[in-house]
Amino acid sequence: VKDIIDPKTPLLCLSKGLEVGSSLMMSEVIPEALERDQPLCVLSGPTFAVELMQGLPTGIVAASENEALARRVQSLYGSSCLRVNTSTDVVGVEMSGALKNVLAIAAGIVEGLELGNNAMAALVAQGCAEIRWLAGKLGAKSETLAGLSGTGDIMLTCFVNLSRNRTVGSRLGSGETLEEILGSMNQVAEGVATAGAVVQLARKHRVSLPVLTAVARILEGDVDPKDAVDQIMNLPQVPEVYTTIITIRKKKMPRILLILLIKIILITQKL
């Protein structure tokens, strides 16, 4: 393929996953396979193809290290029913798209086990934190993880029945085997292959991911879905994650000190 594609031709990547074995993102796999740097833009976000085909309002993200290329993709694909935001945070966009598929399987398992809405909310919240921990370790920006390709895609994939990954989880929770499920599906559920790669990546960077790791263990047949949920519920109780809030009374703090304090907090949150 590298002999056919011009080195200056931009490539558009729509894949959401990590390479099995290497745990590489597609933006890393493509230049490695081509044995050269290639202009690349990643297109990702909360999208079901059937709704795009129906012309329903949709928002996605075009991410490229080359900001001009991201804007070019934005101008090519943006329309009255498709809003395209741009980003230079390729890592954040790709990692969100890959990890949310694994979390969607977990959400489906909770649905299949009929554990209720409280459990669903708690699990997805924990999963969002785990995505933030690992993606942040790799350099993803917090605003990307909170945007369309992060929170937006998580909400769509975890809570809507059209999601293939959620469907796999739901059927696993209902008692079907993975072989039965995959054998009856005409489409690919990316989270199945990605789960193991996520665990491998987490180990490499020493990040604890209880929920996403549990999904990988369930898919590998190492643990029953109900037992996995019980194990997660019996993890040590921990403080809730919170954001620092500053209350400033008029004339109590010099402006320069306030600016310095805010900068310190922002730097701390990025560490």
What is the predicted role of each segment?
Residues 4, 29-39, 57-144:
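Internal alpha-helical scaffold of NAD(P)-dependent oxidoreductase catalytic cores
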Residues 1-55, 73-75:
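Rossmann-like NAD(P)(H) cofactor-binding subdomain of soluble oxidoreductases
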Residues 13, 38-44, 84-88, 147, ...:
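General beta-strand structural signal in soluble alpha/beta enzymes
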Residues 100, 107-111, 136-146, 150-250:
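NAD(P)-dependent Rossmann-like dehydrogenase/reductase catalytic/cofactor-binding core
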